[in-house]
């Protein structure tokens, strides 16, 4: 895929390296030049192409079916503890509402933070916006039944714990180096570079 790489790129010319920017060079006939923001990242294209070529047509069909199967397995297994947003089968992701948290004092964010203490990165939360307190779970096609069952048991245990000790969810996560981050402030006032703190006069 080298001939399709966007510019600029670095070429090794024995003793030195050259920055290649000019599209008139023979080895850049297939390049479309600089990669603009909406085109994405070249590394992502390479990974996607590698994934597709390594699986082939039959393999892609199989992994797609596996992703849908895994999602529906989770949906069926979790529906007794969590509240599916819709009835019926789902595709590759399952959407839950926060109805199962009703009258517990725990919100979707608290539940997601508690998952961190259980060793799981939380699922997408509060999206889509049309579902109140949405939890969007997307199991990948590569998860084994054993790992799915472990995930199911963990979520069911968390829901059972809600009934006995909902206060612990407000403090979660407790096993991480940094506890609750203020995501809203981080999004509205991002710190994009490090500044050295002034020395304290003694």
What is each of the regions a protein language model found here?
Residues 24, 28-35, 52-202:
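Non-catalytic terminal extensions of PLP-dependent enzymes
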Residues 16-25, 45-47:
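Active-site-adjacent bridging/hinge elements
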